[in-house]
Amino acid sequence: MEAVVFVFSLLDCCALIFLSVYFIITLSDLECDYINARSCCSKLNKWVIPELIGHTIVTVLLLMSLHWFIFLLNLPVATWNIYRYIMVPSGNMGVFDPTEIHNRGQLKSHMKEAMIKLGFHLLCFFMYLYSMILALIND
């Protein structure tokens, strides 16, 4: 059972790494004016909920399988994703809003957040890989 948890977590982490890279590429395209703000935000907003669900499922799965350290490591990022989604002001297009993305350095903060998430998911990838190998050896 433990190996199944880490195999699923590893696959989910791969998807989240892909999403983080996609966010970085799309935001850098906006920064370089290759795409406009509206198309950038619509592309990114449709992936916010899948990212939220994917990360939350892994976090809950780790809680249910009693892997406390990895759960506590994932909890702040999952909480941040939920908070960010819930706190979208009414009238905005989503987490990424084309009218506000160039204001107050939001583009830079979104880019920094995507980079931090990429680093976090890469760290988690290797932790899940190590834990999966350890679980398979112990079975």
UniProtKB/Swiss-Prot annotation:
Gene Ontology biological process terms in this record: endoplasmic reticulum to Golgi vesicle-mediated transport; protein transport
Membrane topology term: Multi-pass membrane protein
Superkingdom of the organism of origin: Eukaryota
Xref: InterPro entries: Cornichon
Residue ranges of the TM segments: 5-25, 57-77, 118-138
Chief place where the protein resides: membrane
Keyword tRNA-binding: no
Localization of this protein: Membrane; Endoplasmic reticulum; Endoplasmic reticulum-Golgi intermediate compartment
Record keywords, A-Z: Endoplasmic reticulum, ER-Golgi transport, Membrane, Protein transport, Transmembrane, Transmembrane helix, Transport
Task performed by this protein: Involved in G protein-coupled receptors (GPCRs) trafficking from the endoplasmic reticulum to the cell surface; it promotes the exit of GPCRs from the early secretory pathway, likely through interaction with the COPII machinery.
SMART domains found in the cross-reference section: Cornichon
Record's protein name: Protein cornichon homolog 4
Pfam families per UniProt: Cornichon
PANTHER family in alphabetical order: CORNICHON-RELATED
Subunit structure: Interacts with Sec23/24 complex components SEC24B and SEC24D. Interacts with CCR5. Interacts with ADRB2 in the early secretory pathway.
Coiled coil location: none
Family: Belongs to the cornichon family.
GO molecular function, one term: signaling receptor binding
GO cellular component: COPII-coated ER to Golgi transport vesicle; endoplasmic reticulum; endoplasmic reticulum membrane; endoplasmic reticulum-Golgi intermediate compartment
